[in-house]
């Protein structure tokens, strides 16, 4: 189960990078700078949030599963946010 959850996260992360690059391509210089900062901040938030989520399971065998699942969930939400930005820019 841990491997499946980790693999799911890796797939989501690859999709995130793909969509992020598409968004960056359609932004002007100022928007690009802001998006780069926003994405870096979001990555820090995602990782911190998921570390918080597993704190109650610290040391337990379920921790890796909870952590990977959290990363996947947060990443999938971000993908949808970025797709929305991309759609707005392509109108």
Over which residues does each language-model region extend?
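N-terminal alpha-helical modules
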Residues: 1-91
């Amino acid at each position: 189960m841990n491997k499946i959850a980790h693999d799911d996260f890796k797939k989501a992360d690859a999709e995130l990078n793909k969509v992020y690059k598409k968004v960056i391509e359609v932004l002007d210089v100022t928007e690009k700078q802001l998006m780069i900062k926003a994405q870096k901040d979001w990555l820090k938030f995602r990782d911190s949030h998921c570390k918080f989520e597993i704190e109650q399971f610290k040391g337990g065998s379920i921790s890796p599963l909870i952590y990977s699942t959290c990363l996947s969930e947060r990443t999938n939400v971000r993908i949808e946010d970025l797709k929305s930005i991309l759609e707005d820019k392509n109108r």
